[in-house]
Amino acid sequence: MNPEAVVNYLMEWSRQKVKEAGALGIVLGVSGGVDSAVAAIIAKKAFPENCMTLLLPCESDVVDRMDSQALVEKFNIPYRIIDLDNAYHLLSTQFESYLKCEGLKGKLLRGNIKSRLRMMALYYSAQARNYLVLGTSNKSELCVGYSTKYGDAGVDLQLLGDLLKREVYELAQFLGVPETIVNKPPSGGLWSGQTDEGEMGLTYEELDNYLASGDGSPEVINKIEGMMAGSQHKRKMPPVAMIPPELRN
């Protein structure tokens, strides 16, 4: 991969999509992870005067908060911090007052509340400014549905959606993303100790190898193909019940 050429292409692509939408710029969330770091730097390059980043802590790890702020300040990217803790606690308490799930399912439910709150904050900011919401998911995540429906998957543009995780790391090195971000285990930050690979039950190396070449152990291939099949609904618009013509007569 030619990192410089890819970055230039993504800059022009994002400008074209914003123009087509009649929008003025881009807003995105910065989490402290490598994907959002790469997306934020490219967005700033593409829209020097019309790029806004939101830091949206919600029971977030303090290291992620510090890394997020250090990144946007290093690259002189405009940002706002919107603490979602109070909104999250209010909603989760209300929801769990009538239906509470324990264990992993409970963690996933609560984590998805956080992701959807962030989506709401991003779209509020985008609509107020006539901006588009820029997603930060990579191809590896999108292919297996590793995202929250109407949460981090609720965006207008997926800048990194055709890049494998390892290719995102290549861009991160080229763009000068701080090592503190590049070297940390990828995590959605949905609960304490959560990591992408731990939740998926796969390493990104295994996933990227399969997506790039179809290679992998039988167990890995079966798992990936099962995840791809089970998450198709996340990559499609909701089905519409088409009324047969004879029922309209």
Curated annotation (Swiss-Prot):
Homodimer. InterPro entries: NAD/GMP_synthase, NAD_synthase, NH(3)-dep_NAD(+)_synth, Rossmann-like_a/b/a_fold. It catalyses: deamido-NAD(+) + NH4(+) + ATP = AMP + diphosphate + NAD(+) + H(+). CDD domains: NAD_synthase. Its EC number is 6.3.1.5. Mg(2+) binds at residues 35, 141. One of its GO terms (molecular function) is ATP binding. Keywords: ATP-binding, Ligase, Magnesium, Metal-binding, NAD, Nucleotide-binding. It holds the Pfam family NAD_synthase. Pathway: Cofactor biosynthesis; NAD(+) biosynthesis; NAD(+) from deamido-NAD(+) (ammonia route): step 1/1. It comes from Syntrophomonas wolfei subsp. wolfei (strain DSM 2245B / Goettingen). Catalyzes the ATP-dependent amidation of deamido-NAD to form NAD. Uses ammonia as a nitrogen source. This is NH(3)-dependent NAD(+) synthetase. GO terms for biological process: NAD biosynthetic process. ATP binds at residues 29-36, 136, 165, 187. Belongs to the NAD synthetase family. GO terms for cellular component: cytoplasm.
